[in-house]
């Protein structure tokens, strides 16, 4: 997703672009929003901009290999974490975001302004509360310990980090 595709939040987008252009990229950022207002879209646009090999006019080019991978949410150095639970779309005993990544990609590519209820429907856990469990923290630590596949930044985008339990949060610290 390019900044040009983000609805609203122009001031925030401008600040993110300025930080990236000046080389002041924070090791962690928290984007807080009212549900469906665009924090995920901004995060996706920012990570795409950071990894774009040919940014143009304060936005990612949308054409380089990194941008094409980001458009499909398949960039090898960008990982996604979101609340999950056991459901009919996975056979994993301890599901992680990776268990449902196919459904996440479909949902986020179609509409990066989706809600928690949209996510629960997409991954088949409408009647359960999603959470980010310790197994997820272990998976993220493992992924981040690997060498980057491409040039640019490695990133983890957490959707609804407030769904992380205390043990998971402590593990990530």
Task: Write out the residue ranges for each language-model feature.
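Clamp-loader machinery-focused feature within the broader ASCE/P-loop NTPase space
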Residues: 2-163, 167
């Amino acid at each position: 997703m390019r900044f040009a595709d983000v609805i609203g939040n122009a001031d925030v987008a401008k600040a993110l672009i300025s930080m990236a252009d000046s080389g002041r990229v924070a090791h962690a950022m928290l984007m807080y929003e009212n549900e469906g207002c665009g924090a995920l879209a901004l995060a996706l646009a920012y990570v795409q901009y950071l990894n774009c090999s040919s940014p143009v006019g304060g936005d990612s080019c949308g054409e380089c290999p990194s941008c094409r991978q980001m458009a499909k949410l398949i960039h090898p150095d960008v990982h996604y974490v979101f609340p999950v639970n056991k459901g009919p779309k996975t056979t994993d005993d301890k599901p992680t975001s990776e268990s449902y990544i196919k459904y996440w990609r479909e949902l986020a590519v179609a509409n990066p302004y989706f809600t928690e209820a949209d996510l629960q429907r997409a991954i088949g856990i409408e009647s359960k509360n999603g959470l980010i469990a310790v197994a997820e923290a272990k998976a993220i630590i493992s992924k981040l310990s690997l060498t980057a596949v491409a040039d640019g930044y490695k990133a983890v985008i957490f959707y609804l980090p407030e769904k992380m339990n205390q043990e998971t949060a402590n593990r990530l610290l």
